[in-house]
Amino acid sequence: MSNGDVVVDADQQQAQAVVAPQQLELQIKLPSFIDQKGDLKIPSHYEETITDLKLTLTVIPKTRSLTNYLILIQGEHDVEQFGEIVTFGQIIEELALGEPECLQIQIREKPYNLAAVYEQIIRLREIVGLHYVDKVSQELGSCGGVTRFNSIKLDPVTARGEAEKSDTNEEEQEQGKGKVGKPNEKESGETKETDSQPELSREELLQLSDLVKEIEESPESINFTQATKFDNINGKVKIPLKSFAVSQWSPVPSFQKTKGDLLYLTVQTLENETFHITSHFTGFFVNKCSATTFNPALKTNEKGRYHKHYLLYELLAQLSPSFTKTIEDNEVKLSESTEHPETYLLPNNSFLAFPWVVNASDLKNIPDSSRSQLMLISNGVDGSEIIKEWNNDIQAMKELPSTNFQERLMRDKLIQKTLFDFSKTATETAINIIKGNIAPMNPGEEPDKLIYLKNGVFYSAGTSTVDVFDKTGGEEASRYVSSKDLAAIKIVNRHELKGISTLVTCIVDYMGKRIVCQAPVPGILDAAPPSEEEDDAGAEQEKKEEGKAEEDEEEEIMEKVLYGLSSDSQKILEDKSFEKPLKLLSEVFHLKPHGVKLSEQVKSEGDLVVSKDTKGLKGTDGRKYAIDLYRTTPRDIEFIEAHFKEGENDSYPHGEALIRHEAVNEWWKRKVSALFAAETEKLEKEGKLEKDGSKGTNSEEKSQIALPIDQVSFNPDAFSSDFESKEDRDEVREISKFIKEKLIPEFIEECQHQLAPFDGQQLSEQLHRYGINLRYLGYIAEQVLVKKAEYEESVEKTIKENEELVKVREAEKVEKDRREAEEAEKAKERAAAQPESSSDDKNQETIENSDAKSKENTESDDKDAEEQPVSKATYELVLANYDSLYRLAIQEMVARASKHVLRQIMKETPLELSAKAVAHFHNCLLGGEINTSPEAEIDPLEASFFSQSAISFAKLTHKDVVAQVAKEVGSRFRFTLEENWIEKLVHLPQLFREIALKFGIQWKSFDYTFTKQEFEHSQREQKQESVVDNVEKKHSKKSKKKSPALPIENKPTSFARSSIFIADDIVGFVPLVKDSSYKPTLVDEIFANARSQLLSGDKDLGMAMLAELVTIYEAIYGKVNSQTAKFYSLVAKVYQELGFDKEAAIMGRKAVVLSERSCGFDNHDTIAAYMNSAYFELANSQIANSLKLYLRAMQLWTSTYGKDHPALVNLLTNVADSLYYAKDYESALKLFNAALEACSHLNGQASEIAGLFHFKIANVLVSQQKIEKSKDSFVAANEIFQKLLGPDDSMTDQTSKYISNVAMYIEYLKARQAQSKKSPPPTQTVAPNARVSASQASAKVANGNGTGSSKSKKGKKDKSTPQSDPQIANQSVEDILKFIEGKSKPNAKSKSKHTKA
């Protein structure tokens, strides 16, 4: 883009328009039946649309039941003539109204038709809460969108911390320290760097102590029952009607249609009264019908009174006194249950996350007669609205104007909503296809080749193209490339290429079967469209073709492909009209134009701009479509040649292994960067590139470097035939080598410095971001062990070198001491001639000598402090991160292999026995210690319906399944599991979870046990519970009073088990959906502009843009969406960085709730959101809230990984630091010791971070006045630093001085104590002043794993660790610390930088 500057300016103007629209007040006159005064004022602006107004009316209580109305501008202009997406500014301009600040709008009711009645019914169901009930039956699984956030019981977010910090800042400014920013920053909500925490009350300290105890005693393994105690906010909502449905008298008979009747309804109120209602074009009224008599006329009583209203809601409010009151009570209950509406809001364009383990008590069904009628009232008067031309709709939306912000926003919003609607419709149909509820179009074919057409969508098995890959893996290859095709479609959609379209696509995996869902190319079932070249051909060509054989004509009619390899693979088609649009696609994927030759008969005449397997088709809508985009990345030829051996047992499953787009893009960037560097160097040598605009060159005329980036491309068809150039093959081989030679080593190296993943899904996402395919997991696991061994060797080498260096330094010290001893001896001889002093004088002399020595060292220590080099310590949990990465890699390989084994089992198993097969598989895999030959639960009657081969899964044993999984790991990941790997290498509870998530299984919440000891203990408890239950039942029968009905809980504990799982433990299966939705570029552009404004110093505009961007995210994605959740978390981080701690804390809480509901209650994004939220609460000085959130995060990663995750060290350190600053030293000491223990267990005892914890513990002990005990910790820290950092490192030097000063202080105390026995204590204590800063050591806290660090002030070395100053006996702790640190004045306290997740 040569005109880059103009584009940037346009974007900035657009962003400016986002945050500064012209304001407009809407003065709305309502119909008289709503409000006699009829006035409603709504603030708006010129950029809002009629759609925005309608959405606003749906949330205002007074107008929310309105559905069928006209909107008149200035009392006469109907907005329907303008359209709903037109802005008020455009309407005002069209009507030539000038620039009014107020716009007169009138709402006028319209006569109902049947479609409008359906809309009114749907709105009523939403208002009364029936749509929450619908969710249960319409969901693709059970308990979607659960959350546990409200159970934490956080204190409200307050701004208390800001005031406290501000006061501390003023004190620091008086001392000339800790000054950051301008004094008036407090007014803008910014906070300054400080560590001061509010003084805590006794009650707060007790609360913190209890939370610390919870953290210490947190269980090591997952408790499934506790983990599924979800919030039940919606369960508190009461439906204000007992029954509401379309009446049995519907549809309206012909003789009543002429009277205006549209539909008949039946309602039963909470007062147990039943009313029959007529839906009339004038409104709704109670009629004279009964269950047996049809009379739809208006019902009047003897006084002539009747019930009629234009709005159904208002009519029901007249009929039932409890109706409105119940709705109001529901709203109160919801608001009191949680301060976060995100907890119960329903998504409008995304799926909720379904938990893999479900509390059985949450599995409820609520009666609702109208629920089964939703298909009737939701899809138009004849049900035809469910059938859509999906491709045509999406392409039409993409072609909408996008010249300004509002147009782009509306366009992106419509596209995202339609893509979700497609995915939802396709997923529901795919499930019905798998269950056999829909007939195929080709019933005679094999099951894997069946295709379906339903509701405008084509469905096929993921293996339907198996014939195309018969030599490269067949079914496995076909299944694999379908996902690669979808990945390419998402990229094309995001780039919004003009002139070429892709198919709306999603992939559904359900119960081990895959269905590919695609909206067909318009007209694909019609006769083949002529290409543009054929259109230009004359009549003479047509006459020549008349002589062709009839079969050739039929073949031409069937051929739909106009570009690429023909359907029968017999020729290469090259419609020139496709070249230009496909050229855009090739630029996105860096494809090289190339000739194709498969044989002498099948070859291209010119160069194809895309792969031969990418086909160009033309729809009857006139658009050009590109399909089969899986070949937009090259083959991973190095991997294929090494591991795919067709026909061999140990071969990789298929030969279609492709490189990820991320890897290709990274390779391309580095190649272009190398070209740029080479070209720059060349021009500089030739003198053609002037540096810094020398010779008076104008900035606009600076030299530009033209790079031949089109040469950095590859042939996607390389290695597909024998007729290819060596250059093309070499380029593809280079990209293939790039993964193992560059990307994987860089990934492993980076793992040293960052927090380890929490589960296999996060590991997979990280690998994908790096461009690494999961088939390299085995290689990564092997390399991790190699890198770990190398690191350990380097540490051992470092220790040996430092030990030798220590000996040298000790020898130097001995020599120095010898010389000093000689000097002392001479001084002693000179002093011998003087009179002998008393013991009191000697003690005083000791003190004075100590003072003198300390004073003598002060100047040199001050100088040393100024010139102190930065320590080379990194405090990274390298070994712990390597171990975690290795463990997760093994677990992910085993989980994925288990999924494939289970998929093969399910392929032969009838759907009716799926739960039994899955439970048996899990017993065989995970229950080997309990029962090596578990029995499958198959009822003889059920078995009689199927063949023996269909129930062959029952013959599986523990040994069989473990061997199959190990074989899959070997073939798919090229990794050999060691013997007894199931006991040694994987953690069974976490593997259980991973398989459930990957296969889409929902289990009942139950304390599943995986060891023989735990299982037997569980069985004994079950027997005891059974005895208690029987006693209670007998007692209840004798009771005169009836106990209230309890919800049915399908308890799997009612009988003794012989294995871990039973079929009844499985609640159900959920589909795993991959869709073609994408992130619009609009939000990225605005966010980039907002960050730019913030960095440039315009914080008001930047913050306003961020706030508006939150609204944009909610408009495009909906409030309940994973993308919205991630953006909330991002905005919270920005707020915190700017010092808006309160706002960050509020936004962080919202991010947690949305992550739980849209990502999963124990998803890694949710864990990160909890940790970030804890950090934001801590920054806002709400320590108790922070501890509660950290505790929940730890409980979550215990279920996904185990408590011993490296993040445990991070959490314990952050919490301990917080308690230390709050002066709760006892709790801080407990957690620092726990952090040291965890660090020693995970990362070894001799590590830099272990030394740091010893140092922190010593500081706490000093704060507690346990001086002698602190010396041991200082010594331990010093020994570690000497070994790992060397004797010359600043940390080693400082800890050595600490040890010396502590020893000196102990000597000082002893001398003072001896003197105090002889004489009264002095009125003033003069402390030694050897200046050694304790905080210089702790300032360099781990920057890798978030173990806490201190912020440096504008690049200067931070020399201040917070110390306490409670008053004690004759001295304060501050005096003690000043002595230990050697300072005459306390340093400014620095803020602990707790690492965010």
Swiss-Prot record:
What are the recorded Gene Ontology BP terms?
intracellular distribution of mitochondria; mitochondrion organization
Compositionally biased region (Polar residues): 1314-1338, 1362-1373
The family database entries (Pfam families) matched by this protein are listed as: CLU, CLU_N, eIF3_p135, TPR_12
Please indicate which superkingdom the organism of origin belongs to: Eukaryota
Q: Which residues form each disulfide bond in the chain?
A: none
Q: Give the principal location in a single coarse category.
A: cytoplasm
Q: Where is the composition biased (Basic residues)?
A: 1034-1043, 1386-1397
Where in this protein does the record put region Disordered? Answer: 158-203, 526-555, 686-707, 812-869, 1019-1050, 1314-1397
Q: Where in the cell is it found?
A: Cytoplasm
Ranges for domain Clu come to 368-640
Q: Which Gene3D superfamilies match?
A: Hypothetical protein (hspc210), Tetratricopeptide repeat domain
Under the heading InterPro entries, the entry gives: CLU-central (IPR033646), CLU_dom (IPR025697), CLU_N (IPR028275), CLU_prot (IPR027523), GSKIP_dom_sf (IPR023231), TPR-like_helical_dom_sf (IPR011990)
Keywords associated with the record:
Cytoplasm, Repeat, TPR repeat
Q: How does it assemble?
A: May associate with the eukaryotic translation initiation factor 3 (eIF-3) complex.
Which family does the similarity line name?
A: Belongs to the CLU family.
Protein name (database record): Clustered mitochondria protein homolog
Tell me the organism: Lodderomyces elongisporus (strain ATCC 11503 / CBS 2605 / JCM 1781 / NBRC 1676 / NRRL YB-4239)
Q: What is the lineage of its organism?
A: Eukaryota, Fungi, Dikarya, Ascomycota, Saccharomycotina
